[in-house]
Amino acid sequence: MEAKAIARHVRVTPRKARRMVDLIRGKKATEAVTILKFAPQAAALPVRKTLESAIANARVKADKAGEPFRENDLYIKETYVDEGVTLKRFRARAQGRAARINKRTSHITVVVANKEGAR
């Protein structure tokens, strides 16, 4: 069984979020939460919250199906970061000019699944 969580329009650049996602890809879900909890990067928080949401979704899915739920059997099957909308802002510069500032957003997707053979 697999469960999915998507966080959309997260105010962190996709490049920085991808660094965090690459750290946890393929790992056990509980191990990945611990890694993200102690990562100093600001992008670790939204990735961790999305992962915890995917774990909670797996718990709900297992309860609905009447299956036993073991968090230790979950691993990160798939995780990726897509680019969201870019907020464009302008900063005043010298001599009446303006410089554009791009505030990028991300869509973070995490899919967790049971290990093959685990029941």
Curated annotation (Swiss-Prot):
InterPro entries recorded: Ribosomal_uL22 (IPR001063), Ribosomal_uL22_bac/chlpt-type (IPR005727), Ribosomal_uL22_bac/org-type (IPR047867), Ribosomal_uL22_CS (IPR018260), Ribosomal_uL22_sf (IPR036394)
**A GO-annotated cellular component:** cytosolic large ribosomal subunit
Please give the SUPFAM superfamilies that the UniProt record associates with this protein: Ribosomal protein L22 (SSF54843)
Gene Ontology biological process terms from the UniProt entry: translation
Instruction: Name the PROSITE patterns on file.
Output: RIBOSOMAL_L22 (PS00464)
Annotated GO MF terms: rRNA binding; structural constituent of ribosome
| Alphabetically ordered keywords of this record | Ribonucleoprotein, Ribosomal protein, RNA-binding, rRNA-binding
Show the HAMAP family listed in the entry: Ribosomal_uL22_B
Its subunit composition reads: Part of the 50S ribosomal subunit.
Q: Which family does it belong to?
A: Belongs to the universal ribosomal protein uL22 family.
Q: What does this protein do?
A: This protein binds specifically to 23S rRNA; its binding is stimulated by other ribosomal proteins, e.g. L4, L17, and L20. It is important during the early stages of 50S assembly. It makes multiple contacts with different domains of the 23S rRNA in the assembled 50S subunit and ribosome. The globular domain of the protein is located near the polypeptide exit tunnel on the outside of the subunit, while an extended beta-hairpin is found that lines the wall of the exit tunnel in the center of the 70S ribosome.
- Name of protein: Large ribosomal subunit protein uL22
